[in-house]
Amino acid sequence: MRIIKIIALTLVMMLSLNGVASAESALNRILSTGVLKAGTTGDFPPFSKRDVTTNEYEGFDIDVLRELAKDMDVEIEFVPTDWKTLVNGIVAGNYDISGSASIQAKRMKAAGYSDTYMAVVIKAFTTEDKISRFDGWDSINKAGVKTATTLGTTFENLSKTWFPNSDLTLIEAPARGYQ
């Protein structure tokens, strides 16, 4: 069953908070043009991954966004973005919605959120030859320990807070930067 009211509420919450009229006009535009634009990074498997051979997106977020578009009886258009501008792209009108944006107070000042549809667990990882160096979070927070996380994500702020003594590198594009 198509529940347009719930979908409309979800879109209203994901659009910039410039007022109800703005959100309603965005919803009207989506329905009248027949296109829901979704910002995605394509570098966050298994949630959003761009297949370089076909240029198609796949993953859990992609499936959720496709189902939303299907329920709204509109087409989905994926718009490439990056983590540091994910929410800004919604505010700027580059796209209507996104997925996998963790809730942050700073982001909530600019954009709304739907109900949470997944939870993540934060894990540190390293190569097998270095495992013996680390017996907990405190052993990571030391000078000379190299850490890395993705620029513009919740993990950037957490890494800076949890590991201020480590040598932190910010990676702009995970698919390229962690290799």
Where are the predicted features?
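Bacterial N-terminal signal peptides that target proteins for export
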Residues: M1-A8
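Bacterial N-terminal signal peptides
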Residues: A8-S16
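Sec/Tat signal peptide C-region and signal peptidase I cleavage site
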Residues: N18-A23
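Extracytoplasmic small-molecule ligand-binding "clamshell" domains
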Residues: E24-A101, K109
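Ligand-binding cleft/hinge of the Venus flytrap
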Residues: S48-T54, L65-V74, G136-N141, T154-A173
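Ligand-binding "clamshell"
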Residues: V52, K106-V120, N165
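Short Pro/Gly-enriched coil loops immediately N-terminal to beta-strands
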Residues: G112-T126, K142, T161
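Flexible hinge/capping segments at coil-to-helix
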Residues: E128-V145
